[in-house]
Amino acid sequence: MTLAKDIASHLLKIQAVYLKPEEPFTWASGIKSPIYTDNRVTLAYPETRTLIENGFVDAIKEAFPEVEVIAGTATAGIPHGAIIADKMNLPFAYIRSKPKDHGAGNQIEGRVAQGQKMVVVEDLISTGGSVLEAVAAAKREGADVLGVVAIFSYQLPKADKNFADAGVKLVTLSNYSELIHLAQEEGYITPEGLDLLKRFKEDQENWQEG
């Protein structure tokens, strides 16, 4: 079993991912979605957590061998980033969604030197907007951001465009396509549900029609 499939299996088993193609969730953006993901749940399961963190370490060593500092996005990327940094014996920092409105007004907590080669850790990629804002903040502080790693991606076309436009490399441990096919194989969804989930990936606005 590949790592992507193994992680997808864990996410389904521990209910970090819910699939309801016939009774969709409503995202904050108002989009009706057949999937809901809460990767914070992974922290409660040592076997899953270890699989993810070891996967991150291997992925970073392969894709970003020059890394000098690990940064987690607040808040979901912080625990994973801290564990990765510990495993790799690297400095750790975290990036707030916006600067503090008191004290020193920091947006990055920790110490990042000018030109230090950074990898940013996120738990989930939907459109990529929030993590790319974190990347931009890190660059403003002088970091040399090599790329982003995440547990899971919805593989939305908008995310592909956003990362391409920003010139930021993205590496994810598992993804939507891997998960929905595994879910159908293991009986979490029907073949009809799989078709709906495939349609959502291609067209988030009109996937329920037709």
UniProtKB/Swiss-Prot annotation:
Keyword Lipid biosynthesis applies: no
GO biological process: 'de novo' UMP biosynthetic process; pyrimidine nucleobase biosynthetic process
Annotated binding of orotate, by residue: 126
EC number: 2.4.2.10
Cofactor(s) required for function per UniProt: Mg(2+)
InterPro entries for this protein: OPRT, Or_phspho_trans_dom, PRibTrfase_dom, PRTase-like
Transmembrane annotation, as ranges: none
The UniProt record lists the keyword RNA-binding: no
Catalytic activity: orotidine 5'-phosphate + diphosphate = orotate + 5-phospho-alpha-D-ribose 1-diphosphate
Keywords of this entry: Glycosyltransferase, Magnesium, Pyrimidine biosynthesis, Transferase
Taxonomy, superkingdom: Bacteria
Binding-site residues, 5-phospho-alpha-D-ribose 1-diphosphate: 96, 100, 102, 122-130
One Gene Ontology MF term: orotate phosphoribosyltransferase activity
Pathway membership, UniProt: Pyrimidine metabolism; UMP biosynthesis via de novo pathway; UMP from orotate: step 1/2
Similarity comment text for this entry: Belongs to the purine/pyrimidine phosphoribosyltransferase family. PyrE subfamily.
Role noted for this protein: Catalyzes the transfer of a ribosyl phosphate group from 5-phosphoribose 1-diphosphate to orotate, leading to the formation of orotidine monophosphate (OMP).
PANTHER family, sorted: OROTATE PHOSPHORIBOSYLTRANSFERASE, URIDINE 5'-MONOPHOSPHATE SYNTHASE
Subunit-structure text: Homodimer.
Protein name, as recorded: Orotate phosphoribosyltransferase
UniProt organism field: Streptococcus pneumoniae serotype 19F (strain G54)
